[in-house]
């Protein structure tokens, strides 16, 4: 069987994996020249088209993402605790500083007080040694007041009063023969209370008065007076009290007394019958 010569022989390709060519990449298939001589005037067939370029190699795999630090939350908590401790220490130091400042201030005041006391004591000692006595202390004004209570053995007029025992009081005022003697001019509140009682009521008129004696007046001057009538039921046991009190402008050497109409009916208990005054 003969093959027509107007057709070229099929081309044969060979691959040499060990040979390398500067014009072809490794593994390129090269055509093998045919051993059949070509005819005169026959065109050489065009070379085969170059093979398509190989795809680029795949990119290398990405490195694994770093894991988040496990102790980040713990570090935040630790930092917060340290900040709180810092503020606590700062507050403690500030308090300690304030306390030390107050202590220093108190010590300074105490030292100044001791120094002033020492200076006063030294000055007083020097005055005593030199012979200059210190000024006498100021005397407080004596309060003018008197409170006298009934005297059971009183048998005459004016009434006599207890001025020594019991709840009596005398200050800045003198007591003389049943009367209070004023030694300083001024406003005084004068008061007197007399307690009357009896086994059988006779409704005798009763009077109770406070009067004043002074050499400037020719006779006694009645200051206060109380009268009682129809104060009990006839034939029955009874008791009645009379109280007098008012403000007067008294002068020195005035003498005040108390008089009653029925001395035998007076109860002289200190809580029931009394006489007194005090300066306003």
Swiss-Prot record:
Bias type Pro residues, positions: 43-69
Keyword annotations: Apoptosis, Cell membrane, Cytokine, Cytoplasmic vesicle, Disulfide bond, Glycoprotein, Lysosome, Membrane, Nucleus, Repressor, Secreted, Signal-anchor, Transcription, Transcription regulation, Transmembrane, Transmembrane helix, Ubl conjugation
Residue ranges of the region described as Disordered: 20-70, 117-155
Alphabetized PROSITE patterns for the sequence: THD_1 (PS00251), THD_2 (PS50049)
Subcellular location, record wording: Cell membrane; Cytoplasmic vesicle lumen; Lysosome lumen
Domain of life from the UniProt record: Eukaryota
Domain THD: from-to ranges: 144-280
Originating gene: FASLG
Keyword Transmembrane helix in record: yes
Site (Cleavage) location in chain: 80-81, 128-129
Similarity section: Belongs to the tumor necrosis factor family.
UniProt-recorded name of the protein: Tumor necrosis factor ligand superfamily member 6
Cytoplasmic side: 1-80
GO cellular component terms listed in the entry, alphabetical order: cytoplasmic vesicle lumen; external side of plasma membrane; extracellular exosome; lysosomal lumen; nucleus; plasma membrane
PTM note: The soluble form derives from the membrane form by proteolytic processing. The membrane-bound form undergoes two successive intramembrane proteolytic cleavages. The first one is processed by ADAM10 producing an N-terminal fragment, which lacks the receptor-binding extracellular domain. This ADAM10-processed FasL (FasL APL) remnant form is still membrane anchored and further processed by SPPL2A that liberates the FasL intracellular domain (FasL ICD). FasL shedding by ADAM10 is a prerequisite for subsequent intramembrane cleavage by SPPL2A in T-cells. Phosphorylated by FGR on tyrosine residues; this is required for ubiquitination and subsequent internalization.
Extracellular side: 102-280
Function of the protein: Cytokine that binds to TNFRSF6/FAS, a receptor that transduces the apoptotic signal into cells. Involved in cytotoxic T-cell-mediated apoptosis, natural killer cell-mediated apoptosis and in T-cell development. Initiates fratricidal/suicidal activation-induced cell death (AICD) in antigen-activated T-cells contributing to the termination of immune responses. TNFRSF6/FAS-mediated apoptosis has also a role in the induction of peripheral tolerance. Binds to TNFRSF6B/DcR3, a decoy receptor that blocks apoptosis.
Organism: Cercocebus atys (Sooty mangabey)
The protein's assembly and partners: Homotrimer. Interacts with ARHGAP9, BAIAP2L1, BTK, CACNB3, CACNB4, CRK, DLG2, DNMBP, DOCK4, EPS8L3, FGR, FYB1, FYN, HCK, ITK, ITSN2, KALRN, LYN, MACC1, MIA, MPP4, MYO15A, NCF1, NCK1, NCK2, NCKIPSD, OSTF1, PIK3R1, PSTPIP1, RIMBP3C, SAMSN1, SH3GL3, SH3PXD2B, SH3PXD2A, SH3RF2, SKAP2, SNX33, SNX9, SORBS3, SPTA1, SRC, SRGAP1, SRGAP2, SRGAP3, TEC, TJP3 and YES1.
GO-annotated molecular function: cytokine activity; tumor necrosis factor receptor binding
Listed InterPro entries: FASL, TNF, TNF_CS, TNF_dom, Tumour_necrosis_fac-like_dom
């Amino acid at each position: 069987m003969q093959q027509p010569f107007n057709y070229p022989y099929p081309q044969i390709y060979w691959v040499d994996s060990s040979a390398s060519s500067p014009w072809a990449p490794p593994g390129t298939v090269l055509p093998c020249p045919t051993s059949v001589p070509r005819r005169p005037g026959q065109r050489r067939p065009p070379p085969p088209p170059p093979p398509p370029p190989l795809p680029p190699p795949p990119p290398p795999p990405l490195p694994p993402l770093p894991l988040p630090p496990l102790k980040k939350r713990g570090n935040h908590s630790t930092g917060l605790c340290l900040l709180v401790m810092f503020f606590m220490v700062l507050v403690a130091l500030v308090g300690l500083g304030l306390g030390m400042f107050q202590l220093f201030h108190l010590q300074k005041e105490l030292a100044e007080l001791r120094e002033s006391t020492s200076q006063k004591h030294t000055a007083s000692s020097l005055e005593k040694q030199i012979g200059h006595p210190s000024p006498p202390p100021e005397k407080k004004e004596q309060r003018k007041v008197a409170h006298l209570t009934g005297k059971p053995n009183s048998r005459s007029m004016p009434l006599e009063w207890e001025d020594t025992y019991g709840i009596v009081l005398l200050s800045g005022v003198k007591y003389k023969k049943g009367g209070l003697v004023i030694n300083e001019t001024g406003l005084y509140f004068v008061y007197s209370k007399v307690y009357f009682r009896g086994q059988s009521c006779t409704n005798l008129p009763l009077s109770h008065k406070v009067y004043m004696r002074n050499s400037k007046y020719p006779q006694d001057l009645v200051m206060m007076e109380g009268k009682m009538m129809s104060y009990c039921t006839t034939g029955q046991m009874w008791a009645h009290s009379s109280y007098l009190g008012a403000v007067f402008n008294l002068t020195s050497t005035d003498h005040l007394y108390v008089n009653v109409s029925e001395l035998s009916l007076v109860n002289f208990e200190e809580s029931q019958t009394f006489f007194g005054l005090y300066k306003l």
